[in-house]
Amino acid sequence: MKAQPSCEVGKGSGINQNKPVYVISDLHIGDRSPRDNLCRANRESLLDSFLHHVENQKGQLVIIGDFLELLRYPLDNVLARRKTLLDRLADMDTVYVPGNHDEDVIRWADTTNPPHPFFARISHAFVRHIGGRRFKFMHGHEVDPLANAGIQNLGRVIGRLAYLCEFRQGACLLSNDTVIGLLEETGEQLLHVWTWLLAGLHTALRESCGRLPAGRIRFLTRRIRTQRMLTRYYRDKTEGLYDIAIVGHTHRAGTFGDWYFNSGSWTGARSNFLRITPDGDVGVFNWTDNVPQPNRTVVA
């Protein structure tokens, strides 16, 4: 397992505990090119209405990882083409904890001159006392034994290939997100298989698309990984590192017991978020038709 940062590390530990805290993750935002996740369906307008809701509720927004999709899209392009969104999030005093898909930006956590004001409140994973309990805000890859350097580097290669191919309309390609999910579940064995697959990339991917939809692959692999990771979260909890885990990473919004809360993602059919009251009560919601709808999913 990767070493985790000290519990109190991070600018995020200064969030206002007198406000409701709204938590989102896994938006995987790109540079506005055709397959940018936020450009699909009505996700851009959904996010806009959600941000209005947070502002109207005088809430504190916390983004816990994979906000940006930097395994596929060049950072400079994203910063240039998403400036309006970044400006708005900076004005909202948003706290940002990077994940494994946007970990490149964590280097700005210790600088006084980030490339945009949004990154002024970038933070490592942190613990915050709310309602008398210790809440750990983290992406979740920190306890994922398969989110290792080898997978990450290969993911960058796959992401760049996907970026070059994505302008081909109607191409039957598994998404970068799907391929990385498969790699994380099968580890080193699939790395060898992937070397062989590269020789017949287009044929293999076309056949895979016909046999098993990408969405089904993601569902199966993430469910297995969630169950494995819950054991690791619980061990950290029992060792006294925190009382409540506020995490993302698996794209599966929901709860486990009264201590694990996952913020889901904004990449699927539903867009999810968490709301934490000043008293420490946590709710899981879907943002549907511009209003919050309770999500009562138990993840395992």
Predicted feature residues:
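Surface-exposed, flexible loop/turn segments at secondary-structure boundaries
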Residues: 29, 69, 102, 143, ...
